[in-house]
Amino acid sequence: MYDNLKSLGITQPEDVDRYSLRQEANNDILKIYFRKDKGEFFAKSVKFKYPRQRKTVVADNAGHGYKEINEINPNLRYVIDELDQLCKRDQVEVDLKRKILDDLRHLESVVTNKIAEIEADLEKLTSGR
């Protein structure tokens, strides 16, 4: 699993925290950031440069003109897919934690309101005597 990342020398893909991608001239620059260890001020990162792929395509439907376009390198596309899987997994875990906390707060509110309702009913019973 994560063969493309491992081919880049990333031996522990689970340590990837996030990544950034930018275009610089005819290259795409991929920067991968790793989780910080305790006591570190800055996250470790590695940078990779991928040349953009050049293609000549038909410029119009009549087939008279051609134009040159630049596309993302296919290898980079595979690496980004793996990075998205890793980063999305972390987001899913955070979302699940947030959902559980929201459910817990809602349950707390419901129980608090129910206790107040029962206490009010008890008060009615005791004051009615």
From Swiss-Prot:
Belongs to the UPF0325 family. It comes from Yersinia enterocolitica serotype O:8 / biotype 1B (strain NCTC 13174 / 8081). This is UPF0325 protein YE3288. HAMAP family: UPF0325.
